[in-house]
Amino acid sequence: MKDRLACASPTESAKLNISDFKAPRDGGATKSLFQPPLPDERLAVVSPAAAREAVLEAPPHERAEFVLNVELDTQAFVQATESIEALMQRTGAVSQPGGLCITGDGGAGKTFIFDAISARYPRAATLLTEFCPVARVRLGAMPTVDDFDLGLLEFLGHALKASAAKGEKRTQILCDALRQCGTRVILVDEAHHMIPASGSRRNRDRLAGGLGDYAKEFYDQCHIPIVWAGKPGLGNLFADDGQLNSRWPGKVSLPTYIPGDEWLKLLRVLDRALPMGKPCQLNSAPVAAFLHSVTLGNLRRLKLLLSECVKVAAHDKAVSLTEDHFREASRRLSMNSLPGAR
C-alpha cells in the first residue's frame, strides 16, 4: 500500500443521512396533548455536509463514533427504509397494511436499518400519554409466544400490567397497548430464530413453528405492519410459507460485498462520510484490496475498522488516512486478513 493514492471520482453522486444529527422540526413539541407524530413528521435531517463539518474538530472518540453511526444510502438501505416508512403510512388506513422481510448475514446492516428508523421516529411524550411509533423486539434462541408478547410489552412499558395475563387476554392487552402508544410498525430482529430446528419444521403447513402461527393471528388482530429481519434462512422460510409471504410480502436482501464496482462505490460513499479534512482514497486499488482482505465485504467490520483508523489519525492530527493509520488500526483491533480474502 502507498500513501499517494489516486483521487476518488468527484462526479460520483451519493447521499448520506446522519442519524446522530437530526432535530425536531417543531423543537420536539407535538400538535396536541393526544396527537402522536406521524411518519410524514419525522425528525428533520441535517445536511450530510453540515453533519460531517460539525465533528471535524471533535475529539478522536467522537469522530470514531460518528463513523460507526453514519447512514449510507446504499440501494438496499434506501429500499428497506422507504418500504418501512410506506408501511407506517398504511397503519390505520387499511386493514391489511402488509410487512417486510429483511435478510442478510451478520453485520450486513439489518439492525442498523432498525436503528435508523427508530431514530427517525422516536418516542414522543405529551402531558397525558407517551407515543411509540416504532415498537421493537429481538428474538432469542427457540423463542416462544410469551417471549414475543412480553418483549413488546416491556418495550412499550406495559410488561407488569400483562405479567399475569395469559393467552387471548395477553394478546388483547398487547394490541390495546400498541394502539394507545400510536405504534405504526413492529420491528422484529433476529427473526430467523423462530425457525424450528426439528419437529414441526418438517411440517410444510407450520414451517415457522408455534410463534409463526401466533404471529399470523396477532397480525390479523392488531392490523399493524411487521418487519422481520434475520439471516438468509429467514428468506427461505418466507419463500416456502404462503401464509407468511402473503401477509408480509416485501423482501429486501442485504449484500455482502465482493471486490468489484459495488465495493468501490461503497468505499467512495464512505470516503465522503469520514470526518477527515481531505479525501482518503478508500476506493484506490491498494486500499480497497486491503480493506476487503480484512473485512471480507462485511459492513459492520468495515465501519469498525474505519472508525479506529479515524481515531488514530485524529490523535496524529492528520487531515487524511495513510497506510500507517490503516495498519495501526488493524493491529490495535487484531483485525487481520481473513481466510477467503482475495
Predicted regions and their residues:
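A short hydrophobic beta-strand->loop->alpha-helix junction that borders the nucleotide-binding pocket
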Residues: 132-143
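Dynamic helix-loop-helix/coil hinge segments at AAA+ ATPase domain boundaries and subdomain interfaces
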Residues: 62-81
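Pre-Walker A adenine-sensing motif
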Residues: 81-93
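The catalytic "switch" region of P-loop NTPases
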Residues: 195, 204, 208-287, 339
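Walker A/P-loop nucleotide-binding motif
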Residues: 94-115
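C-terminal alpha-helical "lid" subdomain
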Residues: 2-55, 73, 107, 259-261, ...
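Post-Walker A helix-loop "phosphate-sensing" segment adjacent to the P-loop in P-loop NTPases
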Residues: 119-130, 158
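Mid-core helix/loop region of P-loop NTP-binding domains shared across ATPases and GTPases
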Residues: 39-44, 52-57, 81, 144-151, ...
